[in-house]
A protein has these predicted regions:
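Extracytoplasmic gate region of multi-pass secondary transporters
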Residues: 35-36, 240-289, 383
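Helix-to-loop junctions at the C-terminal end of transmembrane segments
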Residues: 74-86, 294-306
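Cytoplasmic membrane-interface "Motif A"-like loop-to-helix N-cap segments
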Residues: 83-95, 303-314
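C-terminal ends and interior cores of transmembrane alpha-helices
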Residues: 95-113, 315-330
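Glycine-rich segments within core transmembrane alpha-helices of 12-TM secondary carriers
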Residues: 154-178, 375-386
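Multi-pass alpha-helical transporter architecture, strongest
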Residues: 205-212, 408-425
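C-terminal transmembrane helical hairpin of 12-TM major facilitator-type secondary transporters
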Residues: 307-353
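A late C-terminal transmembrane helix in Major Facilitator Superfamily
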Residues: 365-394
Length: 425
């Protein structure tokens, strides 16, 4: 279980929670602008002309590369986070993500560099994945290891707020340039602006994080001589079942979010015929439910427990799977918005307590590594595969099967969460 800390003073607490939230906001902004561009822009700019569906799948494949890279980032940054400290590691992770994102904004396209452009895009995407792989676990520990007793769920949800904030800002960035630029300007140079704008955001994030001090739990662990030589080996050697169950217990959180985000954007604009700007506005408004449900879930987690909150959210997600065909099969604005709001809202309900719940699975000397690996392995299973699988199922078998896919993932997560109870103790 997490160590109990004395409550930090109000000013220090605000600084800690702001740093954990701002950092993840920037990281997820960088991550999501790629996701949006992978559906709307990159198929035309970085891949050969031909079948638009094939180009979109190729673009989504580069999107999925980051999820493969994220466990690598988790292992690298987790190692140093558990050995030299949370603060320095978080600063480095933010810089890795920021540099990779800025480089995407400077890349040549297929028209000028051919297949080399797609390879460079993939390389930058891997860099994004490595950076985010090291970011999330450290941000969660920055918050939870500073939390007073009985407040781990509340503190742990602050870095989670970075996901909806980053999503809304990224969608807003693409909406802004779409409204201000012609289609020719957007595909010529306008798409680069959201990536290059990350320079300012990263500078702000670095300034805030450099003001931090190390967490009390890490200081105690080092003072007691608990530093381990290879945290990665300890996690796999001593806690493989916790890693396995934690991964499966987190997977559906990713599946439901990326179905409501990436899959829905592609299907809504390409198959249902919604204009790009209209659908982005609907997603941005629906994403507010994502942000609203995170603090609700965090507060409830402190009352009933993080695992119990995750079980409730998972049961609701399983039920939501059966609403795919009724709500998302026609050009009905009201039905589609309800679908998006439910999808994003349930994402927040499960995502809010996830950080504090996963942090309880591992002791302080390997907590950064264990928590990061668990989260990012779940990303591979849930996020990287969700949009391609859903696109294939919807195209060949219909939307109902996309819902069945979500419900099946939810059932597997539910079983894992039931068994996690024994491991948590």
């Amino acid at each position: 279980m997490l160590d109990s800390n004395l409550a930090p003073d109000a000013r220090a607490a605000r600084r800690i929670l702001l740093a954990s939230m701002v950092g993840t906001t920037i990281e997820f902004y960088d991550f999501y602008i790629y996701a949006t561009a992978a559906v709307l822009v990159f198929p035309r700019l970085f891949f050969p002309k031909g079948d638009p569906a094939i180009a979109t799948l190729q673009s989504l494949a580069t999107f999925a590369l980051a999820f493969v890279a994220r466990p690598i980032g988790a292992a690298i940054f987790g190692h140093f986070g558990d050995r030299i400290g949370r603060k320095t590691t978080l600063v480095t992770a933010l810089m890795t993500m920021g540099i990779s994102t800025i480089c995407i904004g400077l890349l040549p396209t297929y028209a000028s560099a051919g297949v080399f452009a797609a390879l460079l895009l993939a390389l930058c995407r891997i860099g994004q994945g490595i950076g985010l792989g090291g970011e999330w676990g450290g941000a969660v520990l920055l918050a939870t290891e500073n939390a007073p007793a009985g407040k781990h769920g509340w503190y742990g949800m602050f870095p989670q707020l970075g996901a909806p904030l980053g999503l809304v800002i990224s969608i807003g960035a693409f909406l802004l340039i779409s409204n201000q630029l012609t289609e020719a300007q957007l595909f010529s140079w306008g798409w680069r602006v959201p990536f290059l704008a990350s320079t300012v955001l990263v500078a702000v994030g670095l300034y805030i994080r450099l003001q931090l001090v190390e967490t009390p739990a890490f200081k105690r662990s080092i003072a007691q001589g608990e530093r381990v030589r290879l945290p990665f080996n300890v996690v796999f050697g001593k806690f493989p079942l916790r890693l396995f169950l934690g991964t499966l217990g987190s997977t559906t959180t990713f599946v439901v979010f990326y179905l409501a985000n990436i899959f829905a954007l592609g299907w809504g604009t390409n198959s249902l015929g919604f204009p790009r700007q209209q659908f982005l506005i609907m997603q941005m408004l629906a994403a507010l439910f994502f942000g609203l449900m995170i603090p609700v879930a965090g507060a409830l987690a402190d009352r009933i427990g993080g695992r119990a909150m995750l079980i409730i959210a998972t049961l609701l997600i399983i039920a939501f799977g059966f609403a795919f065909r009724p709500l998302f099969s026609t050009h009905d604005i009201a039905a589609v918005f309800v679908f998006l709001a439910c999808g994003f809202g349930l994402s927040g309900l499960s995502y809010g307590p996830l950080g504090s719940a996963l942090a309880t699975l591992f002791p302080t000397p390997v907590r950064y590594t264990g928590t990061s690996l668990t989260f990012n392995f779940a990303g591979i299973l849930g996020a990287s595969l969700a949009a391609p699988i859903a696109t294939y199922l919807a195209t060949h078998y219909g939307l109902a099967f996309v819902g069945y896919y979500l419900s099946t993932a939810g059932f597997i997560t539910l079983i894992a969460l039931i068994f996690i109870k024994g491991e948590e103790k």
